[in-house]
């Protein structure tokens, strides 16, 4: 009996564990400390700094089953998913790694033992082929002489991509840096499947499938192209779990392995489709639920930017394929539970966040469902009008902008009809929109665009509020100067300073730079490369380069900022506890007045959730835990559980800020000494800033206490107005509102009675025009909203009639036309009111029996009403 996918994953890890490898958990799909990478797309990503010599581990051998996503960015398999046997947005990469430990001989021997060993995968040796780099004689000899593969199944691959070392069998991280040859292992599915061995004209067929790539990091490539041998060569290998499972389960498509068979069956059930492993839509959905669920689990939330937009594209592609299968209701979120069953031990983290993942997927599907049908109809209409086989970029952009159709979803629909999308035209339309947004945003120029500073400033503000320093540079109007005079604004650079430069959401310090001859008032502090710039105005004297000054921060302002920054950390931790671990920081502002925190979450917070978060933060404030700062290497910080901002680039040494066991984050800002210093934390606003992004604004310390006093004062004022006290205020206000509601109802009844009386008197004023009753009247002291009631009453009284009523309120004319049903074939209310409205500078419309309009030309009203009789007569 074949091994299951879960058993194969575990067997791989167990094998390398017996060979002295550390089993390392899969890292997040969101790469930490590598802003160049959209998603984790290979097993070596989490070891990149180790291979570069910038990080050290306690082990020299490692093995992983790494979750990977290839959708968006350089590595994008999205458009092929569902249409081929082996493309996926999500896959698991099995890998073993040597950091300066073993090299080619052991790497090849381990791979062969695992693949062919009777206690392991037990593949037929004659089914395996290998490739090596053209000049890698060492690897060739190991395969031929040590392993014993016949020469005819060992293929040398040269520079087959048009440049030196540009080869399928030569790996390089970039134009320079670590690189080296690789050897790949292929499985031969047999003669019944079309395709040739690697390097042959038929190599793109499905007969010979690559199952393992073993990279030998052997050289350091210099800018001039020379290759220098590395002192400690390393090994990086990768084997797709889904591919090796297909081989071991004797199937030709990844979608036929047990994991996908089970998922596809569930997809068919929830969409009402026929269970068919070859159905492209079933394949797409089964693949996409894996990438979507694990991306959300790792903190990505659907949005219109960056990683969030890639996730949104994948979700919407799945929803559209569900629509094709006939799914009538939301279905995608229902696949999370069955996904957990097939993932086994690899889904433990997903299991903890199952409810959150399901809710995010359901919300996203409900939002897209509102526009999906209309968007598909528009696309169908455009394709029906198409004379060629290319859909223009403007239409693709309109589908994106109006209906939320990612361009690849539009391309997906078009491909089914052998039509392509002008993606270049789409990109132009997208860039035009971005340019318009930039032009209308009013954002100023970045400080770093204004001046270039070569100096370096040492920051002492963690421990000091003032600092004796020397002026190393002065900039006025973006130019370097040696001296400034009283009244001049400038940026002053010091060799060392206690002033914190704006960073990580915390605003820059303010204060005074002074000596016996001058005083420079600092209103802001910013970074300029390695220098810290003090922005402000010289209030008196003369300040020159090389002057010695005393730099003193505004301590009261800094203290307020410190409290708000520490409260931000507590807020972040509390949100993750109350809302779920999908919450991650998306932006922040910390100043002396308040804090603002943007975070990923799929819906508005409920009032009770806001209260729970506020209570949790205040409980930690009352704990009065020490705020501890430690310097450590980044890897140690990760092990300690410190939260880092995804996409941020950190130095080798990082500052880790801890508040008891409640919060641990990487942070370079200034903070309170103890959580109790915060005093009181109050949330003053919660709102949305973009799809999937929420914002909380909060205050602390004195500001929070002041807000409590203000609320109490307001309650007391209201209590006095309604003749109550604070304790019974709610009941008193409720009684007052009930009374007001009753009076409004009574007033409306009186108005209705008045309207009925007026209607009775008006009915007698109707005249006959060609045998039809016509009533035209301008009313005084009548509210516009009463006109409709009066028309209905007059219809009942007159039986058959045309009624035109008007009134003037707030310097505006209100008109209404009513026509009884028996007359609408000749006189349509909408046409009549348009004729009258045009004469008073207005417009209107409605049904054939009732229409309303408004206008601004009061003086023209009498003549407009006089014209009604002639208009009616001409149509009878």
UniProtKB/Swiss-Prot annotation:
Notes on the domains: Consists of three domains; the N-terminal catalytic domain, the editing domain and the C-terminal C-Ala domain. The editing domain removes incorrectly charged amino acids, while the C-Ala domain, along with tRNA(Ala), serves as a bridge to cooperatively bring together the editing and aminoacylation centers thus stimulating deacylation of misacylated tRNAs.
Q: How does it assemble?
A: Homotetramer.
Name of the gene: alaS
The EC code for this enzyme is: 6.1.1.7
Assigned protein family:
Belongs to the class-II aminoacyl-tRNA synthetase family.
Q: Which organism is it from?
A: Photorhabdus laumondii subsp. laumondii (strain DSM 15139 / CIP 105565 / TT01)
**Residue positions binding Zn(2+):** 565, 569, 667, 671
Gene Ontology BP annotations? alanyl-tRNA aminoacylation; negative regulation of DNA-templated transcription
What protein name is recorded for this chain? Alanine--tRNA ligase
Cofactor(s) required for function per UniProt: Zn(2+)
Catalytic EC class = ligase
Does the keyword field hold Cytoplasm? yes
Q: What is its main location?
A: cytoplasm
Top-rank taxon: Bacteria
Record has Disulfide bond as a keyword: no
Keywords per UniProt = Aminoacyl-tRNA synthetase, ATP-binding, Cytoplasm, Ligase, Metal-binding, Nucleotide-binding, Protein biosynthesis, RNA-binding, tRNA-binding, Zinc
